[in-house]
């Protein structure tokens, strides 16, 4: 039987339930709530009609009060307007909770883009073996970041979670109490979170959502796709930026990095302990229960007394496999699925739970490296190796960076950023020792604009008594010019024998990050996206020529202006000329709670990502490939839109408008993130230093989507005027 269209399902469940539960607000014991709920629709109607007539906001508000509430004092007017905001905020939370509750009804959990659909499609086209082969080599890497786009405090997110459960259970009394709780709960934070606070809030999603949803997917693949064959791939990697992302955040220290890594390990061990405790109630068989309880005890001791009781990952894996073997050999495989579920999760999450990435700006690295070379102890240690470094050309500087190594202590330096940069590398080694190599094995260089930017990090790793660093060095290309130069930079990197030797030790794979947010801020929507697409094609071709595998790590935000949108459709649309053995992307702030906040939404969206990568390889769609005419059209559109965007940015009042008319000055004053709204300490506003999030967010708050679409209309209109629009539509 055919399902109703999605919009009909949405109206039937979400909209109708919202109307029912929204009426509960009127029953809450708040003095002004009836007045607010009665006045709000009238006010909305005045706003709608006034906006249609082109009236400014002040005139609309004054007209409303003069006509409807003429006796109100200025204080009472302000109070009512503030009550409107409070009321609408809580209506939005209710709507979010109802959406979460109705997710499985509105979205087809077994439809297109899900693993079940993909498996059936592969089966019917005789591609099941091909699918298995591909799944053994394909990965999705979700990197959680604490970018400040989540305005809800943790207490409100908790209420949303409880509300969605209550609505699913049709518990009217509980829902009413939760709405009253919502009415008494602050929607703002008293103080800025620390980087560790941000890490803790995101670890909640790892513990309560991803641990189960990703585990379920791996379970499904083993049971239904691979069956008697073996899945030798964990499928998912989870990355983690809070506590490790130093780019523009002076509050991320080496101590915070280590503390965050310890918290990640503690959290995953706690999940293993809970799973073992649950297993002990089922696996009550002779010879099995003793093993489960012994393992449970060892995990408990490692959790709460790690210094005295160390636990090796290999031991945990071996014991679980022994328990599985006993179930099969002596107990007819009873509850085998439960022990396999835990085995898969241990393989997936190890002792690291999520891999911490370190990230820093290349300009900071450059300053740090200059400080290193001026240091007396370093000069004494390295001698002629670094002589005249600053006066040499880039080729010779890179030659030195490739050769130098040693044991430079952070204690050599009084400069804070230099000492902390080197100390962070020592912390990397410590995390790998405690949590396994995956605990922290990637170093991202933001604003990467040269070969030297990459080799400076390579040199610092080897100067930290780490001759063969177990670290993936990842250049992040963000601006339009850096994206255009990325291929020549990476080509020089691939022609460096010492670096290639390092790359071979890392599986002959180079990860390259591409920044959608800063790219769009720099060049506008069309130019940024087209430049990234072309960079991926060129870098894929280059990597193939050098027999190197390349993985693209996409720095994507929530809105289109920061690379957001329908992520799975984006990956579906990539042509066959782009290497895609991995999908790697950042998931930021509010996108985490909205797309991965519940078990159902998390599993659904993870499956969509997984199937989007598979689809391009197993069911090849040549319609995604662009021909010469398509490329010419895109080049022209991107160039025209870029010029319009650049001309707008060059307007003498552009920055003044941002500072004085939009919400930009308030971003730095909100308590939604630990990171400052701009890089550096300059008081004067500079687009180069301004973060993409406040830039995009400020335009968005003003209802002017400049970063998302400015210049696109100009380019499209040019084709329309010249009767060439069919070239755009083809």
Residue ranges of each PLM-predicted region?
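Acidic, glycine-enriched catalytic cores built around paired aspartates
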Residues: 2-82, 100-120, 185, 234, ...
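Extended, highly charged
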Residues: 2-233, 255-312, 356-359
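Conserved structured core elements
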Residues: 15-18, 173, 200, 204, ...
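Intrinsically disordered or highly flexible coil/loop and linker segments, enriched in small
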Residues: 30, 52, 144, 169, ...
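Structured, charged N-terminal subsegments at the starts of enzyme catalytic cores
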Residues: 122-128, 132-141, 217, 221-224, ...
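Structured alpha-helical segments in the cores of large, soluble enzyme domains
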Residues: 133-136, 140-147, 164-187, 339, ...
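Generic, well-ordered alpha-helical scaffold segments in large soluble proteins
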Residues: 209, 213-220, 224, 271, ...
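Catalytic or ion-translocation cores adjacent to nucleophile or general acid/base/metal-coordination motifs
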Residues: 254, 260-280, 464-643
